[in-house]
Structure formats: structure tokens, C-alpha cells
Amino acid sequence: MGVKGREPSFVHHGSSDEGEPVGEFHYGSASDPQVLEPGKGIKTFLTDPPYNLGFDYGPEVDDKQPEEDYHQMMEDVFDACYEAADDDANLFIIHYPQDLAKMWPRLTKKWKFHQWITWAYPANFGHSSKRWTNASRTILWLVKGEPEFYGERVVQPYRNPTDKRIRKLIHEEGNIGTSLYNWWVVNLCKNVSKDKRDYSNQIPEELL
């Protein structure tokens, strides 16, 4: 799935690089044995694999493989993720739903299904005279063991903040919003986006 990427980066709690380390982020190829070393204890995998649609990612990625070869590659990578994962871990896969359906037995061979999340985005391309415009992808959430969930850390604003019950939650209990739905509307990262970097198919920062 590409050549080895740059060195990992580390995230620390607090404003400096001397605080408690809370995250280690790796970039690049999942085939790098140092990234997916068995027993490494990784807590979360956030993946956006090539979709095998013939997209030009550059010379390091083959995005047009025979379907069986592609499915086997995906199985091998996510099996390696499982072996490198902590006893309680999350795996998120961003992909198109029809392709995830084809690979379902492979994806859930070791990992356990947890939730199906839909990422919807406005799109002015891909229109068809035979079907509705495709303007969404799936974020498949798989788990190993029983990872902790901190849903209260990412919330959406209340839709009726003037309601008496909601006002109490806001002003007396300090709540700033309610739980997210299992569908998220997030714009694509385009060439004019503020968070755009030198990458051919970048996932929007808000989604991450």
C-alpha cells in the first residue's frame, strides 16, 4: 500500500512537548513491519485505504488490482492491525459501502463489528442519469475487546437551546451539546480548503 512514510509524530498532553505522551501517529505504508509490529499495543487505527478505482495516487500506489488481489491485500493489512493492536482497540475504515459489503467476511474474521457511520458530503461531480448522485462514504468501526468510549468529548450543538429542559442542561449542568448521530456531514477537502496539503486525496481535518 505504498512506500514507507515519514517518521512517526508524538502528541503530548499540554501545550509543550514535555508533557505526558498521549498519542503516537504513524504515516505511510501499512506494510512497514515497524508500524504493525505484533504485540505493539496500538489503541486506535484510522485508515483510508486506496479504493481500487484506478485513482492516480502517484507511482508508489497501485490502485487498479484484480479484485481478489485487492481483497486479499486488505485482509492481510487488517489482520496485521489486529495482531499489532492492544487487547482493547478500535479500527476505523473509510471506504465505499458496496466495497465493504464485498469484503465483510474478511474484515470481521478477527475484528468485531461495532458501528456503521455514514460520512455525507456535498458533491458537484459524479452525476448520473440512472441513479442518485453518490455523495457519501462509510466509516466502518470495528473493535477488538472492549475499548473505552469517550463520546461526551465530541458533541453536536443542541437543536432547541431555548427549550426549558435543554436550558437546564446548558446553564445548570454545563453541557454544551448532545451525542453525535451515526451520520456526519463534513465537506470534502478541496484544493481551496484551508487545511489542504500536498496530497492527492486528502481526508478533511474535521473528519479526523
What are the roles of these predicted feature ranges?
Residues 1-6, 10-207:
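Core catalytic lobe of class I
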